[in-house]
Amino acid sequence: MISGPFLHFDPTVPLQTVMIGHPATSPLSLPSSSSSPTVADPSNIHCRVCERRYDGSQHFGIDICRACAAFFRRSVAVKKTFVCRRGTNKCELNTVSRKTTCQKCRWMRCLLVGLNVDAVVGRRSPDHVKTTSRDESVKKEDEESDTGSEGKSCEDMDVSHPIEQFQQQISFSVHRPIPTIGNPNIYTTRASLINKVLINYNEFTKSRLDVELSLKHMQQDSKVFGSTGIPIVPATREIISEIYQKQFGLLHIFLKNTFDEYAECDVQEQKRICAMFYPVLWEIESCYWTYRNMPVQPEYETLMMCTQTTYIDSKNVRYWLGNTTGLNESDIQAVEARLENLLTKARNLVLEPMHKLIIKEFEFITLLALNIWAPRNHRGCVSEDRAEQVRDALFDDLHYLYCDGLKIDKYSSRMGEMMCLHTEVQNADMSSTIKNILFSDLNAYLYSI
């Protein structure tokens, strides 16, 4: 009898509880239908900065409320630096009144969720869209209460130095993408599937990060800090194997809550889909996280993000191998050469096109979803027709986002570049190398549960 997490997953259980056994605050509660026009209950959507419930719109490409977007824009425009009066840098932001909210902690949270200082152009978010009349009163109330919360006491604020104080902690400048779609109202937009994938993926990513931060590799001293302030340490075989085995159940929950087509498959077919997708997931995510976190500078050009808290240096892959006692030196050198070649290919074929395209978050999400349901992964299988239906829905949504979201009249060139990138990701040689080098242990684990 098959045992293990595939027989015990309950999508209503908080993800952190499933994987690391402590209480969580945000379960995946979205409906499982891929085609439903209603993506989420508005009462369950919260700003990623202040954690208040809001209408689900994006500002600067991030799921934050108008008040926090306005706070961030003003803070950058007038070069404000804040001080936490409690001295903890961990203040509660979802307070009764914004006037009592700690602005230092609010600012740090803005940077943590991915808001980019360089995106503030002309004191206005590049993806700013005029709100409809039904939202005007809400916007006015939010911004008025937010204005008063910035504080005029010198105890709260020092306007003499811009953003360098926090950036010094991060230690390097960061190349970040242009924000995402212009008007992603997730309740009325026709692009329901892409938005649903995006919302569930963000929850999936957050839950995986919680797992990583709980593991012992985070106790290393040799850390660097990306744009989010999350510590990143050198990866080893053992670390990566432990991380992916602990996170595997979260992938199943993400797919089951996002795609009806996956939920309808039997256990063995679900395992097959996961096994096929994991190498491609690493390929896309590692390049995208590198694109988001690593600066475009010569000293970082050999670094590739491996997970959210680890990286591999293509010039020091022996460190990744870890303990090689008892192994033949020629075998070690052969693995080193294959890994170096893999990282170079990933950078040239996937990462560089992302930089050239200045890929947006919804395009990354679309690329991810297309590779879950790629034809080569389902040809001749029971899920072949289901995969075709998902791809049709994704392309319809992508058309809508380009036309009505970004307002691009002639988007054929951009769509073509996206499909070229999709083709590179589908490179069979790269996927098989990733599977053999990075996921050989995971495949054995997957089919043993």
UniProtKB/Swiss-Prot annotation:
Species assigned in the record: Caenorhabditis elegans
Name listed for the protein in its UniProt record: Nuclear hormone receptor family member nhr-43
SMART domains with a match to the protein in the record: HOLI (SM00430), ZnF_C4 (SM00399)
Coiled-coil positions: none
Residue ranges with Basic and acidic residues bias: 125-142
Chain segments carrying region Disordered: 125-154
Residue ranges for the DNA-binding region feature of this UniProt entry: 44-122
GO BP terms in the entry: regulation of transcription by RNA polymerase II
Observed phenotype of the null mutant: RNAi-mediated knockdown reduces expression of homeobox protein lin-39 in vulval precursor cells at the larval L3 stage.
Zn finger (NR C4-type) start-end: 47-68, 84-105
GO molecular function, one term: DNA-binding transcription factor activity
Entry keyword Transcription regulation: yes
Start and end residues of each NR LBD domain: 200-449
Role summary: Ligand-activated transcription factor. Positively modulates expression of homeobox protein lin-39, perhaps by binding to the sequence motif 5'-TGAC-3' in regulatory regions of the lin-39 gene, acting in the embryo, and also in the vulval lineage.
Keywords: DNA-binding, Metal-binding, Nucleus, Receptor, Transcription, Transcription regulation, Zinc, Zinc-finger
CC per GO annotation: nucleus
Gene: nhr-43
Compartment annotation: Nucleus
Keyword Transport assigned: no
